[in-house]
Amino acid sequence: MILTITMNPSIDISYPLDVLNLDSVNRVTKVTKTAGGKGLNVTRVLKQLDADVLASGLLGGFFGDFIKNDLNINGIKHSFSDISGETRNCIAILHEGNQTEILESGPNISEKEANNFLRHFELLVDKANIISISGSLPLGISKDFYVKMLSICNKKDKRVVLDCSGEELRQVLKNDSKPFAIKPNIDELSDLLGVKVKDSIEDLKLILNTPMFNGIEWIVISMGAKGSFAKHNDKFYRVIIPKIQVVNPVGSGDSTIAGLTKGLNDGETDENVLKIANTLGMLNAQEHITGYVNMDNYKNLFEKIKVVEV
């Protein structure tokens, strides 16, 4: 079983408009509301791959119940830890080829609720083959919370695919409890290091060989239309992807994480792990809906991706 974790889930609301009129009334006829958050995007793609997946994290209030119901409708198993606060909304206004986002910060989690989740998480980890943890931490939870979760997983010899950035990732990298795999993009890597990272093979090799990344078996660097660069133990790979028509890139990183997690869980070769991950990321970018892939196009894209050891 694959366990996915979303610590700060949301209801993702999409408002498509021909024109956004500021300081005026804007009427929307077609509204889309889905269970959101990076980990739940990962979950939906894994479900489309027919993976045995269980979603967990923190949920509360009416909006938390909405998310549970949405997952039930889509046949996705879940086991969340309840909180007293209200799960957040994230609003995307699609207008004139632009996307304006209004993101609520979400509920403030108490120390008791955080500890309750850790106990719940430990029980779920026992049943999991691999764990995918994605996204930011909610208010009230310390930035080293992922370190605590990783410590639980490492003690049980369970692999973790971690997709986070900023201070959460810094805390992970400076501690002994490391994930099995991470997937920063070039901008997140630059923010982490405090310098502009170039996407040259030589520079990326030097960076990924620095001590801060010691103990992480897989590192995949997303480079958008340029594909990706990866390190697995002592091997480096350049992933070259075909040019595609991008419809909506939001959620492509989450789809890539789903593919990475699925490939690792299934014991695929290095080449196939990277091809699966990149194929799913591209498939998501070709859709209007976040966390959705059209598997009819999977084989065609998969066969066009090249993985070269460098």
Curated annotation (Swiss-Prot):
GO annotation, biological process: D-tagatose 6-phosphate catabolic process; lactose catabolic process via tagatose-6-phosphate
Pathway: Carbohydrate metabolism; D-tagatose 6-phosphate degradation; D-glyceraldehyde 3-phosphate and glycerone phosphate from D-tagatose 6-phosphate: step 1/2
The UniProt record lists the keyword ATP-binding: yes
Swiss-Prot/TrEMBL catalytic activity: D-tagatofuranose 6-phosphate + ATP = D-tagatofuranose 1,6-bisphosphate + ADP + H(+)
CDD domains (UniProt xref): FruK_PfkB_like
GO MF entries: ATP binding; phosphofructokinase activity; tagatose-6-phosphate kinase activity
Signal peptide: none
Keyword Transferase among UniProt keywords: yes
Swiss-Prot/TrEMBL keywords: ATP-binding, Kinase, Lactose metabolism, Nucleotide-binding, Transferase
GO cellular component, one term: cytosol
Record family assignment: Belongs to the carbohydrate kinase PfkB family. LacC subfamily.
HAMAP family membership: LacC
Protein name: Tagatose-6-phosphate kinase
Source organism of this protein record: Clostridium perfringens (strain 13 / Type A)
